Amino acid sequence: MSRVAKAPVSIPAGVEVTLNEQTLTVKGAKGSLTRVINNAVNVVIEDGVIKFLPVEGAVGAWAQAGTTRALVNNMVVGVSQGFERKLKLVGVGYRAKLVGSDIDLTLGFSHPLVHKLPAGVTAECPSQTDIVLRGVDKQLIGQVAAEIRGYRPPEPYKGKGVRYDDEEVRRKEAKKK
C-alpha cells in the first residue's frame, strides 16, 4: 500500500485545477500542464486539496495512486514556482552559448554541437561554462539536461565533461606501472 498516495496535494493561491473525466489540467502563473490520469485512480478535488484514491479491485491501484500523486504534485509546483536544472562544462575549451532557442556547445569534438530546445524549456548561459535550464515540466527539464550531459558525460580520470551542478564525479586513480 502506497503511503505517498495518502497525503493530499494542496493547491496554492493562483493555481487552478480542473478535472474533466480522466484528464487533469493545472494552470498557474508560469503556464499550464495537462495529464491523463490512470483508470485505477480516482481523483477528488475539494477544499483546496487534491486527494487520490485507488479504485477497488484494481491490480496495483495503490502504486498507481502514489505515482499519480507525485506527478500531479510536480505539476502544481511547476506551474506555481517552476523548475530549474544547472549544468557545468568542465574541460579546456568547453563552452556553451545561446543562439536563439538553441544551445551551441563546443565539447572537444571536431565540430560544434547544436542542441535544439523543445517548447516549454528556456535556457540561460550566465557564463561560458554554465547552463541553466528552466521550465514548468520537471520531466522535460530533466530529459533535456540528460541529453546535453549525454554528449560528453564526465569521465572518471580527469573529471572532464558535462555534469549536473550538484553531481559528484567519482574519480579513479591512474594506472600504476
Swiss-Prot record:
It comes from the Bacteria. GO terms for biological process: cytoplasmic translation. InterPro entries: Ribosomal_uL6-like, Ribosomal_uL6-like_a/b-dom_sf, Ribosomal_uL6_a/b-dom, Ribosomal_uL6_bac-type, Ribosomal_uL6_CS. One of its GO terms (cellular component) is cytosolic large ribosomal subunit. Pfam families: Ribosomal_L6 (PF00347). The keyword Ribosomal protein applies. Residues 152-177 are annotated as: Disordered. Keywords: Ribonucleoprotein, Ribosomal protein, RNA-binding, rRNA-binding. Residues 152-171 have a biased composition (Basic and acidic residues). GO terms for molecular function: rRNA binding; structural constituent of ribosome. The keyword Iron-sulfur does not apply. This protein binds to the 23S rRNA, and is important in its secondary structure. It is located near the subunit interface in the base of the L7/L12 stalk, and near the tRNA binding site of the peptidyltransferase center. Belongs to the universal ribosomal protein uL6 family. Part of the 50S ribosomal subunit. This is Large ribosomal subunit protein uL6.
